[in-house]
């Protein structure tokens, strides 16, 4: 799970301290959503925004978090199908690689996995990629089945039913 908070939210400074030693929720992945107007104000010299930005960067240096999600940039560059439907991308997942829309009724979820490039020669001429996609789809099907009737996961279940978002990437590319 990743929690994202708008950088101009009144609780941003408290949010940036969530992962401090002694905090009861140190294991939370977190990100900040930064709109264009806020970033431009900060660049133009707004001292309060510069202080907040410095705290964001200091936190990233110390803890690797928060992830930084540039809201307007993401929505300008979202797929045309999302633009045509008026879908808004509000946040991302715990590593900020997924850009899916969400609403009050639908909380996005995605089943992800990776293929290890170090082992590429072992799987390049096989059906491993196809099987991995089938596996991810089976995981999503099980999620849908097991969350039926669960009020607390109903918005995620609704998204899974409508979108069936799967992602298969690679690791070890460097």
Q: Which role does the model predict for each range below?
A:
Residues 1-88, 170-174:
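Conserved, charged catalytic cores of large soluble enzymes
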Residues 60-67, 71-174:
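Function-dense linear segments that define catalytic or interfacial modules
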């Amino acid at each position: 799970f990743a929690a994202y908070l708008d950088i101009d939210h009144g609780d941003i400074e408290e949010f940036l301290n969530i992962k401090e030693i002694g905090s009861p929720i140190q294991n939370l992945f977190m990100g900040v959503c930064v709109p264009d107007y806020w970033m431009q104000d900060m660049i133009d010299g707004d001292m309060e925004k510069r202080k907040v930005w410095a705290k964001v960067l200091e936190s990233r240096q110390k803890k690797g978090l928060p992830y930084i999600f540039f809201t307007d940039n993401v929505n300008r560059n979202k797929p045309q199908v999302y633009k045509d439907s008026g879908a808004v991308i509000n946040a991302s997942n715990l590593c900020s690689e997924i850009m899916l829309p969400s609403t009050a009724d639908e909380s996005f979820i995605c089943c992800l996995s990776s293929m290890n490039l170090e082992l590429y020669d072992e799987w390049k001429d096989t059906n491993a990629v196809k099987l991995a996609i089938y596996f991810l789809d089976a995981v999503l099907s099980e999620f849908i089945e097991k969350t039926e009737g669960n009020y607390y996961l109903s918005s995620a279940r609704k998204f899974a039913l409508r979108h069936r978002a799967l992602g298969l990437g690679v690791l070890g590319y460097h």
